[in-house]
Amino acid sequence: MRAAIRQYSGNIPVTVVSVNAVSECAVCRRSGGGGLAESVPLRIVQGELHNGCFMEKIPFIGLYDLVMKLDALLDHLAFPQRDTALRSFGRDGIRRYCRMKEDLLPRLEQPWNERVMQDGWGRCATFSVHVCTRQNSSWQGSVRWLEAKEERKFRSVLELSYLLESALDLEPKDETSV
């Protein structure tokens, strides 16, 4: 796996996303006026992200957590640089993001150690995420699904999350059926 990541990375930092668990549940809510209850399916992806510049794996729970932590990691690397400043409805949103970045910084200060990647494959799926640019308040780049050896380009964080979800949607093939 290390050779595949090095070969793919070139000069751009590549982050490996290992998905170790996918859990599904339903969130129920009642519509106004005591009417019918709606059930909305919710899917939670859990795993770790690793970057070749740092020693520790960073755990995440949910795609939102993955995106926020990866964004903080890209800010720390200062590559690729964002082309717009963060905006918020209030200072609390920016402060929360800055606190999350500060919590991650001690983990990001340690240099790369090859032992980190010895158990690098995720139990559900493993992706190599290559963010080339951060323009228009989003990311552009490519993602490679390592188990399937497939690569796709993405034009936004939303499109990246669709690609990750679509790989996790695939049912495992039943080897016993004819």
Model-predicted segments: where are they?
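Short aromatic-glycine-(Arg/Gly/Cys) micro-motifs in beta-strand/loop hairpins
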Residues: 22-24, 30-33, 37-54, 132-148
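Intrinsic disorder/low-complexity detector
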Residues: 1-32, 68-137, 167-178
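Mixed-charge, glycine-accented linear interaction segment located at domain edges/termini
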Residues: 53-75, 140-178
